[in-house]
Amino acid sequence: MRLFNWRRQAVLNAMPLVKPDQVRTPWHEFWRRFRRQHMAMTAALFVILLIVVAIFARWIAPYDAENYFDYDNLNNGPSLQHWFGVDSLGRDIFSRVLVGAQISLAAGVFAVFIGAAIGTLLGLLAGYYEGWWDRLIMRICDVLFAFPGILLAIAVVAVLGSGIANVIIAVAIFSIPAFARLVRGNTLVLKQQTFIESARSIGASDMTILLRHILPGTVSSIVVFFTMRIGTSIISAASLSFLGLGAQPPTPEWGAMLNEARADMVIAPHVAVFPALAIFLTVLAFNLLGDGLRDALDPKIKG
């Protein structure tokens, strides 16, 4: 016994001491990969700044975005008083772009959230149960995919009526099949894994398997696609507002601002440039952030 204890102590002494801060969790691995991607980090900072601006836009904006009118400077370009210039009604474009960030970002995020929630549920059911569940859900997705996204959104808004709330519903509807197919594919792969068979063998219910084992395995893919889909949704919402089907004047939504700027683009191009630039930078940032998240969450990528 004494010899055994001596040998055990010798083995323990030979083992390197691992400090708590040296233990690498999945979060540490993700952060290590993500922070090496400079474009993704820049995009993440931009998105964080955009979210802060959107939350506090009403307080940050130097002028009232809807009820301030400077009739002495109609269509004037950028100046110290009005950083982005003034539109044809005398409204401060900088203030309207800031408040527009709140509306456009909320429309994009809520639309994708609704589409992701419904699409994830349908994808889990189709991939796990297969059979008629799978055939029914996938045929519905095929029908929705047969229409161009913006055309489907226009049709939905035409039925429901104009307004930002209906735009969110319309954009969410054509986001559903994309998430459903993504989650279905992941579910079909995960349900064949041995840990799923083990869960079944101990009597785990289908609900437990779906929520505790399969859904967590699809989260990384959902997060990446969710992030990139926000940019698409912002463009779609802005397009509908540009066509007069979304936010209505004087609401300072970016697409609606572009619609109002059409008549003055030749004599006052700044009226359209700044809302368009806001859309471009926001969509680019979300796409770059999504690319960075995908690379950081991909277990095959080594630092």
From Swiss-Prot:
Gene3D superfamilies: MetI-like. Coiled coil: none annotated. The keyword Membrane applies. The chain crosses the membrane at residues 40-60, 105-125, 144-164, 165-185, 222-242, 266-286. Residues 101-290 form the ABC transmembrane type-1 domain. GO terms for cellular component: plasma membrane. Belongs to the binding-protein-dependent transport system permease family. The complex is composed of two ATP-binding proteins (GsiA), two transmembrane proteins (GsiC and GsiD) and a solute-binding protein (GsiB). Part of the ABC transporter complex GsiABCD involved in glutathione import. Probably responsible for the translocation of the substrate across the membrane. This is Glutathione transport system permease protein GsiD.
